Amino acid sequence: MSQWPSIKAKRLLSALFGIGWKLKRQSGSHRTLSREDWPDVVFAFHDGEEIGPRMLARIAKHTGITPNDL
């Protein structure tokens, strides 16, 4: 079983902002996030959209977020 829960995109975005990611630009639902010493990440989810555990684990690899950050 995955250590990652299923959460709403808005909650994940708030958690990413909490660990230092900043909004660089936005075009529709595509948000480009940046953080010092990390490559930019495109966050392409609507706020109310549910993000499953497998996708959340993939996002974590690119952003450095942990289950405790949520």
Model features per residue range: what roles?
Residues 1-70:
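Basic nucleic-acid-binding interfaces
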